[in-house]
Amino acid sequence: MRTSTDIPAVRASGLVVRRGDRVVLDGLDAAFPPGVVTALTGANGSGKSTLLDVLAGVLRPSAGRVTGLPAGGVSFVTQAVPPGALPLTVRRTVAMGRWRGRPWWRPLGRDDRRIVDVQLERLAIDGLADRPLDELSGGQRQRALVALGLAQRAPVLLVDEPTAGVDQVSAALVVAALADEAARGVVVVHAAHDPGVIAAADRVVSLP
């Protein structure tokens, strides 16, 4: 089990991101420590999703840098997954979280399958395991994508709007799962608008 002393804080230093003529992030400095859930807040267009993209390494900033990213990699759950993008069952979708770094010819082992089962139960989608992902409601699909991210067991977990489109009961399951990840020493950062989800976070970083 990882502890918060095993994983350094992820730090953003002087981040500048431009999209065309617009400056989305302007010299942002922020730290994201392990062992706590950090919520990113701010108005639409304030740069929450952009910051997650930079932390995940999928977007290069115009200036500044991110340090402290551990060798174990980053698990990034994004909203930008259209329903038909993953023509898989829910179980196979979540199992994708166990394939990173694994040779294509090596099948998932018993421990991998156990981890997948745990995440399905954790997000209360075990009863949907054999359903195609594109047949699910938006909220069910969101829970499956969060479960995929959890299945990676990465030292850094980034989630864009983790409770988007889910009901209150499902939102509580997602929030509890994020808190559990933080409790095992993971760096957990999510962007949120929901006041209840923000209130459940340990820290809040507000973007102007």
Task: Outline where the language-model segments fall.
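Conserved structural motif at the start of ABC-family nucleotide-binding domains
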Residues: V10, L25-G27, A129
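The feature captures the beta-strand-to-loop junction immediately N-terminal to the Walker
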Residues: T41-A43
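Helix-to-loop junction immediately C-terminal to a conserved catalytic motif
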Residues: A56
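Conserved ABC ATPase "signature" region
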Residues: R110-L128
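Conserved ABC ATPase signature
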Residues: P132-L136
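ABC ATPase C-loop
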Residues: G149-L150
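Catalytic Walker B motif of ABC-type/P-loop ATPase nucleotide-binding domains
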Residues: L157-E161
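Helix N-cap at the start of a conserved alpha-helix in ABC-type nucleotide-binding domains
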Residues: Q168-S170
